[in-house]
Structure formats: C-alpha cells, structure tokens
C-alpha cells in the first residue's frame, strides 16, 4: 500500500523543520504530515513510490563482469539496456524513482539521497538490501551462519540478537529495509535454497521468523537502529516440481493452510512491515497476481497492513515465464490489481501504471 510506504518515508524526514510545509515539519504528527504530503502528490509521484531500481554501482559491476550474451539473455544481474547511470540519476532528481535495492556503499546511498532532495517534494528514497544472514552483500560487515544453521540451534534468542545487530549494520550503510526473514517451509531437500530457510517445521519456522522480525524492526521505527523486515516468499515455493527453483507448485487448500501460510500469519501478527511474493505459480496462478492469496487471505483474513514488493523481475515474468500476460503492461495490470505495491525492479513500470490508471 502506497500509504504505508509513505508513512515509513515520512519517518525518515524527522530531521527536517519547515514551518511553511507541514510534511517537512517534525513538530506535526506523522498522520498530519502524511495527509499533507499525499495531498500535494501527483499521480506520477505516487506511482514513483512503487518504482524500484538497482543501485548504480551494482549495475556497473554487472556490466563489467557479464558478457554481451549474458546481458542480453540473463536477468540474474541488473542491466538496463538503453539507460545510462546519468539517466537513472536524473530520474531520481525528477522524483520518478522511490526505492533502490543493493546500494552497497554509504557514499552511493548519500549521493542518491542528495539527488532525491532535488525532486519537487524532496521525498527520501527507501533503500533495501538482501541481508538473509547479516548484511553480507556489503564489504566489511558481519556475516552470520545461514538460517538453516541458526534453526538447528533451536535458540530463538540468537536470531533475535542477530536481527538487532544486522539492523544496525544495514542502517549504518544507508539502507532502511532488509529482505529477510525467509519463512518458506522447506519440504523438498532438492530445492537449491535450503540454506535460506529455517527448516521443515511450520512452528519452528514461524518462531524463528518472528524473532528475526522483532530483532530487525524493534517496537519503534523512528530510531536509527532498526529496519523494515520483509517476510518472504509468499507463498509455497519451497516444494516445487522436481525441486527446481521457480517451478510451479500444485497444492491442496489444507496443505497450504496447515504448512505454508502459517509462518506468514505469524509474521503478520508480529507486525512485519513488508512481504515479498514468490517466483512460483500456485495451482496455475502466479504468486504475483494471486488476488485470493495477496488480498483475500493476507489483507482481509490475516489483516496484513504493510506493503508488498515483487521478487526480482517477477512481475515481468507473468509475461515472459508464466505466459499469461501478453506484455509487461498487462502483467503490471494483473499484479497491481491483485494487490502488488512495488516493482523490483527497473524501467517502464512507472509509465505503464500511469497509462493503466488514466
């Protein structure tokens, strides 16, 4: 939900003081500042808060290390054909990007935030990073044991403390959002992402997921020692056909509710701010456009009040992988209509959403 995203953004404006503009004045309540900001935003500026790009240096590394064929045919690293770094920087300054992921240095994070301050409303960027066992993508940070190793200790307090320390290191490097915990319930040991999970038992996975969320977010997001947690991957991608990541999942309603949905219900009850959708299809419907699960179950039944983010390029995969949408624009329609709030990642999302609304 765009409003939830903006509440978090407004919290990062706490150091500003401008008596003429309420949303920039920390003397007003969050609700007053948020209402003031929303009233000033154009459609383009609202959709920009749903638009995420990969960090500029991450793109440079991909371009440097990938062959021309890999850039054309692989989406495992970020490469935006036809867009230069200066073009993306200008989009930030124009208020057309609301979020980045994988910004790997404080210097780059600060530079991107400086560019965002040039935009009309000066809305800060929301920056996220994969931190599944510590802020390990960033050089010099603490790397903890993988989640499957942590779960084998049966010591939930360790996970809580790791969440606290990870949050400090993530914030210290300019990010506000950690794409963790992974609360997939592992049921096929052939699956290549075993190490990211807390194991095969829904109860244990739920317990460890809750402690990680509490450690990362704490009780008050207004400080500098906590980050947004992200429960992933919603849902049921951990017992795929032939054990292959991204493969479809055929599952009964009973198994879905008794096994795979339980940790997400626990995460919602723990106050998780964000949820990431899964790569896979569930009974023939891609998770990123599964309105029954995203809206009917999570929003209406579980009372999830945070926001959804897609997994890596998965909205476009409704077209290129699942073959349901005829193009990216139609894929966006299906995803946003189902409840998706933010696209990870890249160009053409902003323009297509605006066209669909208009």
What are these regions (language model features)?
Residues 16-358:
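Glycoside hydrolase catalytic-domain context in secreted enzymes
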Residues 4-13:
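Sec-dependent N-terminal signal peptides
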């Amino acid at each position: 939900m765009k409003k939830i995203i903006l509440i978090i953004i407004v919290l990062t404006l706490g150091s500003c003081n401008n008596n003429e503009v309420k949303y920039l004045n920390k003397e007003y309540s969050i609700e007053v500042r948020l209402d003031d900001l929303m009233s000033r935003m154009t459609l383009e500026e609202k959709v920009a808060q749903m638009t995420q790009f990969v960090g500029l240096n991450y793109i440079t590394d991909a371009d440097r290390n990938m062959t021309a064929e890999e850039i054309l045919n692989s989406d495992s690293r970020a490469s935006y054909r036809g867009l230069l770094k200066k073009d993306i920087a200008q989009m930030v300054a124009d208020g057309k990007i609301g979020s980045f992921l994988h910004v790997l240095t404080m210097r780059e994070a600060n530079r991107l935030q400086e560019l965002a301050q040039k935009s009309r409303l000066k809305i800060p960027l929301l920056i996220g990073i994969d931190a599944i066992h510590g802020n390990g993508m960033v050089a010099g940070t603490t790397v903890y044991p993988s989640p499957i190793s942590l779960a084998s200790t049966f010591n939930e307090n360790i996970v809580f403390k790791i969440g606290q320390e990870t949050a400090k290191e993530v914030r210290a490097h300019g990010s506000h959002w950690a794409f963790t915990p992974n609360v997939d319930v592992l049921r096929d040991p052939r699956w290549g992402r075993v190490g990211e999970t807390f194991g095969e038992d829904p109860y244990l996975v739920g317990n460890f997921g809750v402690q990680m969320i509490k450690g990362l977010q704490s009780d008050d997001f207004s400080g500098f020692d906590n980050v947004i947690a992200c429960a992933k991957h919603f849902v049921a991608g951990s017992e795929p056909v032939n054990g292959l990541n991204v493969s479809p999942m055929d599952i009964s309603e009973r198994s879905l509710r008794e096994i795979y949905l339980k940790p997400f219900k626990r995460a919602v009850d723990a106050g998780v701010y964000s949820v990431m959708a899964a790569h896979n299809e569930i009974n023939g419907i891609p998770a990123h456009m599964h309105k029954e699960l995203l809206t009917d179950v999570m929003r209406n039944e579980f009372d999830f009040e945070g926001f959804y983010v897609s997994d890596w390029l998965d909205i476009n995969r409704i077209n290129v992988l699942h073959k349901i949408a005829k193009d990216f624009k139609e894929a966006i329609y299906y995803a946003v209509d189902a409840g998706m709030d933010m696209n990870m990642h890249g160009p053409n999302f902003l323009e297509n959403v605006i066209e669909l609304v208009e």
